[in-house]
Swiss-Prot record:
Subunit structure: Heterodimer of LeuC and LeuD.
Function: Catalyzes the isomerization between 2-isopropylmalate and 3-isopropylmalate, via the formation of 2-isopropylmaleate.
Enzyme class: lyase
Cofactor note: Binds 1 [4Fe-4S] cluster per subunit.
UniProtKB keywords: 4Fe-4S, Amino-acid biosynthesis, Branched-chain amino acid biosynthesis, Iron, Iron-sulfur, Leucine biosynthesis, Lyase, Metal-binding
InterPro entries: Acnase/IPM_dHydase_lsu_aba_1/3 (IPR015931), Acoase/IPM_deHydtase_lsu_aba (IPR001030), Aconitase_4Fe-4S_BS (IPR018136), Aconitase_4Fe-4S_dom (IPR036008), HAcnase/IPMdehydase_lsu_prok (IPR011826), Homoacnase/IPMdehydase_lsu (IPR006251), IPM_dehydratase_rel_enz (IPR050067), IPMI_cat (IPR033941)
UniProt protein name: 3-isopropylmalate dehydratase large subunit
Family the entry assigns: Belongs to the aconitase/IPM isomerase family. LeuC type 2 subfamily.
Length: 425
């Protein structure tokens, strides 16, 4: 019986010839990741073990991105605690305000993650790195602490669902529309503890940023991980994002012809339309064409680990160029990293945003989790390029969050209601 791409990576890191769905294994780790919320708990668990040093000073990665720049005393203390630990242990890949970015945009940009890696992160959207052909998944702070000490983690080998992507998507249809469509089809538990394995001729039409977005939201379908095959675009990205702090070996895995999948879906990308997830679950999807009444919005958030990359900002700038944000609408744009921010400045995107009436912020996860910088009041509605729209996710429990692509978010910012780009371009 053959193995899926995910299973092959796990078998290699567990030093086994093969693994099977449901098998418990212990695997070597290439990266252990934490942020300013999860690292303090992991550090305390690490300290309980009585071990002097982390297993590898380059493979333990800490990014202060959630409540930064610090929003209050408690968040400042969390960051201080993490900063002190990283310094005392000589953690090389520690990213603080000024050079940090949103972690799941930053790590690929820095070349810290690559094809064939096994990565755990104390953040549920660690599944993002599957876009590079890696196995990456979110864990709790306890497993992060143990991983920092041992360089190993236990896993139950997941089953898999194959998604065969066909044909070329139309203009304005992005990775966000694709993954929202899929989640709408299978539900928020449709891939529970399974790997979402993407393949098909449609993959070649997807940019790396599209693939990052799709894998980022695999967890919103309950998946253990999402993963794409390694192709020329993947290798071009990897070769142009070399890690300066450690040597990374690229290992390419392909699913066996006789790999077993629990389900197989075919998605015709050419038939997809701009898709929005309505409150209060990512599965509550409709195309913009299916919205039968105006939904006026109070706030637009563009950015996050889902859609804070340069291609996302390029689309937003194209739509906003020469236009003004609708009266009464607050628009906040968060470049995913300092590098993305600087590139957006150099290309004139930031000027376009500010002239349109948007606020532009340093990289932060703040508004996505209702932490700071864009909290919603009771009764307010926001359209957002983030990844979750649960009750109270971005503020008051009586607020509403609609998830959409950067293109739909930008168009909505101009019209003041949920709209698609063709309505204004």
């Amino acid at each position: 019986m053959g193995m899926t791409m995910t299973q092959k990576i796990l078998a290699k890191h567990a030093k086994l010839n093969e693994v099977k769905k449901g098998q418990l294994i212990e695997a070597d780790l290439d990266v252990v990741l934490g942020n300013d919320i999860t690292s303090p708990v992991a550090i305390r668990e690490f300290e309980k073990l009585g071990i002097e040093d982390v297993y590898d000073k380059t493979k333990v990665v800490m990014v202060l991105d959630h409540f930064t720049p610090n929003k209050d005393i408690k968040s400042a203390e969390q960051c201080k605690f993490t900063r002190s630990f990283a310094k005392s242990k000589g953690v090389v890949n520690f990213f603080d305000v000024g050079d940090m970015g949103i972690e799941h945009v930053l790590l690929p940009e820095k070349g810290i993650v690559t094809a064939g890696d096994v990565i755990i992160g104390a953040d549920s959207h660690t599944c993002t790195y599957g876009a590079l052909g890696a196995f990456s998944t979110g864990v709790g702070s306890t497993d992060m602490g143990a991983g920092m000490a041992t360089g190993k983690c236990w896993f139950k080998v997941p089953g898999a669902i194959k998604f065969v992507l066909k044909n070329k998507p139309n203009k304005w249809i992005s990775g966000k529309d694709i993954i929202l469509h899929i989640i709408g089809e299978i539900g928020v538990d449709g891939a529970l503890y399974k790997s979402m394995e993407f393949c098909g001729d449609g993959v070649e039409y997807l940019s790396m940023d599209d693939r990052f977005t799709i894998c980022n939201m695999a967890i919103e379908a309950g998946a253990k991980n999402g993963i794409f095959p390694v192709d020329d675009k993947t290798m071009e990205y990897i070769n142009s994002h070399k890690c300066s702090t450690m040597t990374k070996d690229v290992n390419i895995y392909e699913a066996d012809e006789d790999a077993v999948y629990d389900e197989v879906y075919e998605i015709d990308l050419a038939k997809l339309k701009e898709t929005v997830a309505f409150p209060h679950l990512p599965e509550n999807t409709r195309t913009v064409d299916e919205i039968d009444k105006d939904i006026k919005i109070d706030q637009v958030v563009i950015g996050s680990c889902t859609n804070g990359r340069i291609s996302d900002l390029e689309v937003v700038a194209e739509i906003m160029k020469g236009k003004k944000v609708a009266d009464g609408v607050r628009v906040m744009i968060f470049p995913g990293t300092q590098k993305v921010y600087l590139e957006a400045i150099e290309k004139g995107y930031i000027t376009t945003f500010i002239e349109a009436g948007a606020a532009v912020s340093t990289p932060t996860c703040g508004p996505c989790l209702g932490g700071h910088m864009g909290i919603l009041a009771a009764g307010e509605k926001s359209i957002s390029t983030t990844n979750r729209n649960f009750v109270g996710r971005m503020g008051h429990v009586d607020s509403e969050v609609y998830l959409a692509s950067p293109a739909v978010a930008a168009a909505s910012a101009i019209t003041g209601k949920i709209s698609k780009p063709s309505e204004i371009i």
